[in-house]
Amino acid sequence: MTAKPKTAPTDLDTLSKAKAKVELKRLSLEIERHNNAYYQDDAPKISDAEYDALRHRVEAIEAKFPELVSSDSPTQKVGAAPARGFAKVQHAVPMLSLGNAFSDDEVAEFLTRVRRFLKLDAEQIPAIVAEPKIDGLSLSLRYEHGKLVRAATRGDGFTGEDVTANVRTIKDIPHALAVAEPPAACELRGEVYMLKSDFLALNQRQETAGEPPFANPRNSAAGSLRQKDVAITASRPLKFFAYAWGEFSDLPEATQYGMLGWLKRAGFTVNPLITLCKSVDDALAFYRKIGEERATLPYDIDGVVYKVDRLDWQERLGFAGRAPRWAIAHKFAAEQATTILNGIEIQVGRTGALTPVARLAPVTVGGVVVQNATLHNEDYIKSLDIHIGDTVVVQRAGDVIPQIVSVVRDKRPEDAEPYEFPKFCPACGSHAVRDEDEGEAVRRCTGGLICPAQAIERLRHFVSRGAFDIAGFGETYVELLYEEGLVRNPADIFALHSKVDELKAALFRKRESLATQREEKTGKKRKSSLSEEKRQYTDVENLLAAIDARRTVAFNRFIFGLGIRHVGEVTSKALVRHFADVKAFLDGVDAAALARPGPAWLDLKNVRYIGEITLERLLEIQGGADTNEERQGFQPDARQRASLLSHYGNEEKIAGALQAARSEAPGPAFQQLANDSEIGEVATQSLIDFFEETNNRQVVTALMDQVQVERPAAASAKSPISGKIVVFTGALERTTRDEAKAIAERLGAKVASSVSSKTDLVVAGPSAGSKLRDAQKFGVKVLTEEEWAEISGNE
């Protein structure tokens, strides 16, 4: 059945007050849904342009009927209420959003309003600070006497989410202000974001881990910051630009531009492109220049923000509704195009995640030919009511991953059928079930090792650079040897020496197949030669030699190579610190399984306002402390009591739940891993789940019979770089980047990917770029590769 296109909105000139009231109610509900999707779920359902169009309609109706403006209107609110699971934080000064301009005329009108409000003479032109509008997550940082005490998301503008623990892992955010006389109290604000390159690398890790890719850098930054597991946030390459403030006990500067300088001196990163403009022409020239450079910037922006420079004028201008009169956002037009959706392909990752990919008729979007686009997940497809054959609007989300943002329903073919997400794995036919614990409700194949797609992805991961790193054992070999039945699990790779004839035959068949395809395509017959036979023999010998070279492997690479969900390179290295060898590792995971928290404990933990402090008190009581509190039982505060009553129903059930939770608290073996900031509860549970699967344990046992696992050499306490943070930049000539990193870690250093005020050393090779400039900015010691070789003993 063909869906009906949306009815065009009534023209404002003919819109009656009664109809306006109904439309405002509908628009308010629709905008609220999209606010929740964007701010709480980090999963927007519509494009920025579509969202702005909804808001513009509300503003236009309210301008005609000002008596219909209500306190719950979208024009009077910002963002969305804080999500459940985080403590609420009241902003001392509200974090309001900005009004938007979409044309040069609207920017000029903004400045005219400013001059009119301030009653400035014609020759008095207010200076304007122009800054790139970073597409990230707004954050407020509260400092008291120079120390970071709290970090909160914007939330609804008045109340945000407490993300202090997660924010402390972001290198760009100082824990103490680097100024001689810090204010008694201040709220400093800015944007958490992710570099495009880091986003692409993160998505590659997601794909390697068999997880769905993130939609764009903004969503991945927001989702990373709002993780309940701090270890996950710490593993994500988040960055922060400071650009504003809320409460401030004593402002040290009189202008916006001057305050940006103070923020830099205090230890924050301030966007270097920010410019002080003396006229509207200067501001618009900046906008055009940034627009031209947008594609080459290392981070995503969606416009330019203009702010009146003088702070006394900002104070006089004040606010109108949800936005300041002294600032406005000049938005970029979205890079979009329409094309035909030819089909949807389901890709199966290493952990069984089913990820939909749109196959499109080729179309150019922002100068790039797009044939594939992300559809995120099952719920996203349903929300857009996607049919195969639809005409769809494609947008380069975040200038990186193309995505389908809407359907042109009036162009839908009569025979188009709605897309049904598969309930069975397309690779093995096993049931595919929704994992409701995932933020995006991912559907996963239950086939495990019998699923060829998962098995092939796991084998690819096993031989990859960060794992066993078997040279030459690429994607082609993995697929070929799996299809030929020669390699079905990692241990089979090391048994290929006993199957040399079968291996040669498999390679011969593959080459013959490719040659036949070439002959059919070109019409030219291939001549067999001795050189081809020799090449085939050499390929086999080289492959077997590369395999032999990896029969001894570092402990952390062994763990990472197993492809355990949520156990990446950082977590693998952390696990090595806890266990002496593989046997101790397996025994430790088994002990953690026996010590894992029970359902009653987990249920209590998920009750609102029952946080880590409460859980720790329960643990103390569980330990049998002979105190009055132990005899009387744990006493929640009023807020916790109300939440417990809402969750359990009555006092008797609360008492029973507390008693049950105490008996099901996690034991030391579980806590040892879960409390490590680089492991965390999620990875600990994944380890338990992995080794409780008999097939997985058998694979590991078989692998241990084939390889020797060696523990990394202990870090030298006497090393001159022990405990220091080191960053490598530029092209290294003596060693590879991975080798240099391994040497630094062996000597007790921590290797970081970016330079901050906390960095101790930067090793700069030829063609060093922004990291070298950052080192000079922060006063970090810079070493040449020769100097590094000398202090690391790698001459």
Curated annotation (Swiss-Prot):
Database matches in SUPFAM superfamilies: BRCT domain (SSF52113), DNA ligase/mRNA capping enzyme, catalytic domain (SSF56091), Nucleic acid-binding proteins (SSF50249), RuvA domain 2-like (SSF47781)
Gene3D superfamilies tied to this protein? 5' to 3' exonuclease, C-terminal subdomain, 6.20.10.30, BRCT domain, DNA ligase/mRNA capping enzyme, Helix hairpin bin, Nucleic acid-binding proteins
The record's section on CDD domains has:
BRCT_DNA_ligase_like (cd17748), LIGANc (cd00114)
Q: Where does Zn(2+) bind?
A: 425, 428, 445, 451
* Location of the active site: 133 (n6-amp-lysine intermediate)
Ranges where the BRCT domain occurs: 716-795
The reaction(s) annotated as catalysed by this protein in its Swiss-Prot or TrEMBL entry are: NAD(+) + (deoxyribonucleotide)n-3'-hydroxyl + 5'-phospho-(deoxyribonucleotide)m = (deoxyribonucleotide)n+m + AMP + beta-nicotinamide D-nucleotide
Instruction: List the HAMAP family.
Output: DNA_ligase_A
**Membership in a protein family:** Belongs to the NAD-dependent DNA ligase family. LigA subfamily.
Return the PANTHER family for the record.
CHROMOSOME TRANSMISSION FIDELITY FACTOR 18, DNA LIGASE
Query: What's this protein's name?
Result: DNA ligase
Q: Which organism is it from?
A: Rhodopseudomonas palustris (strain BisB18)
Q: What broad taxonomic lineage does this protein's source fall under?
A: Bacteria, Pseudomonadati, Pseudomonadota, Alphaproteobacteria, Hyphomicrobiales
